[in-house]
A protein has these predicted regions:
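AAA+ P-loop NTPase catalytic core and its hallmark functional loops
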Residues: 1-174, 178, 240-244
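Alpha-helical lid/collar subdomain of P-loop NTPases
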Residues: 8, 121, 154, 159-160, ...
Length: 244
């Protein structure tokens, strides 16, 4: 599906929980398509100038410096905006001319209009869970993207990933995945973020280095998820029940 979107110059939105593999997926697709990848981590202070570029003062005057979005447009790269809803709406709106038939990037400060080079593609990602409780994309922006839904892989596949990436044996990997699935069931009980595959891999790497399994789970999985004493207690109980 992603390859077809790229071939037809369609912008893509990757939707899924934190740590489920969205960034790894886009890195793989850029490699598979043979395109350079420009990654931008979005945040509240990200401005249009941070994306497009700005004039810099030099000893002999001023010089224009392209931002990462402009470089991607010129080079025909895949431009990946990670967690796009963290950016302000007045920043996101500069993407609109690149997501329709025009495929252009107007640069007001220089008066230049850049036509996207062959191979350019705009890709954004966001977490539709916790982020929608705080902020969301405008409908006028959402409808410019083809949406691909992501989720955590099935248990056996996730265990294989944890074993490979974390370096633990399959039995420990299955235990970590089982713990992760139990903890994900706490989302409706006040847990804002569920444990990602990334957290399970972090715990696996600690275990590989010789850290006891329960302690590795506490510091790599339980503590990053919550500061609420009651939730921490419930999660620690699940760890103890999983690795008896």
């Amino acid at each position: 599906m992603f390859e077809q979107c790229h071939a037809r110059n369609l912008a893509v939105m990757l939707k899924g929980p934190t740590g489920c593999g969205k960034t790894r997926f886009i890195e793989f697709m850029a490699w598979r398509l043979g395109r350079p990848l420009v990654t931008i981590s979005c945040h509240d202070d990200l401005t249009a100038s941070d994306l497009i570029g700005r004039f810099l003062i030099r000893h002999d005057g001023t010089a224009w410096q392209d931002g990462p979005l402009t470089r991607a447009v010129r080079e025909g790269a895949i431009c990946y905006l990670d967690e796009v809803v963290e950016a302000r709406q007045d920043t996101v709106v500069v993407l609109h001319p690149l997501t329709d038939y025009r495929r252009i990037l107007p640069i007001d400060k220089t008066g230049e209009t850049i036509h996207a080079a062959e191979g350019f593609q705009l890709v954004v990602s966001y977490n539709p869970g916790y982020q929608r409780m705080l902020k969301d994309m405008k409908p006028s922006t959402r409808q410019r993207f083809v949406a691909l839904d992501f989720n955590f892989p099935p248990a056996e596949r996730e265990a294989a990933i944890v074993a490979h990436e974390g370096g633990v044996d399959p039995t420990v990997a299955r235990g970590l995945v089982g713990l992760g699935q139990r903890l994900r069931g706490l989302q409706d009980r006040g847990l804002a973020e569920v444990p990602s595959t990334r957290l399970l891999i972090a715990a696996a790497r600690l275990i590989t280095s010789g850290i006891p399994v329960p302690l590795a789970c506490y510091v790599a999985i339980v503590s990053p998820l919550s500061d609420e004493p009651s939730l921490i207690g419930a999660m620690r109980d699940l760890v103890d029940a999983t690795f008896v």
